[in-house]
Swiss-Prot record:
Part of the 50S ribosomal subunit. HAMAP family: Ribosomal_bL31_1. It comes from the Bacteria. GO terms for molecular function: rRNA binding; structural constituent of ribosome. GO terms for biological process: translation. Pfam families: Ribosomal_L31. The lineage of its organism: Bacteria, Pseudomonadati, Pseudomonadota, Alphaproteobacteria, Hyphomicrobiales. Keywords: Ribonucleoprotein, Ribosomal protein, RNA-binding, rRNA-binding. It comes from Bartonella bacilliformis (strain ATCC 35685 / KC583 / Herrer 020/F12,63). The keyword Flavoprotein does not apply. Binds the 23S rRNA. This is Large ribosomal subunit protein bL31. The gene is rpmE. Belongs to the bacterial ribosomal protein bL31 family. Type A subfamily. The keyword Transcription regulation does not apply.
Length: 73
């Protein structure tokens, strides 16, 4: 491999929605940072076969519905 062109690959902590915390290696963040998940394999409808619930982070879904909700599709 060429030197000095690859991102830093380090240890981080991942916290799932139920509070479970595990350690993995990633290029995300810095060494020792914590990544808090909003959706994970224990809550995602595709993996649990549950109903379609939508998490609206930052109001994007609400903004879209306000803008295009009257199209009647």
């Amino acid at each position: 491999m060429k030197p000095n062109i690859h991102p830093d690959y380090h240890q981080i902590y991942v916290v799932m929605t139920d509070g479970t915390k595990y350690t993995t290696r990633s290029t995300w963040g810095k060494e020792g940072d914590t990544l808090n998940l909003d959706i994970d394999p224990t809550t995602h409808p595709a993996w649990i076969g549950g109903s379609q619930t939508l998490v609206d982070r930052g109001g994007r879904v609400s903004k879209f519905k306000n803008r295009f909700g009257n199209l009647g599709v």
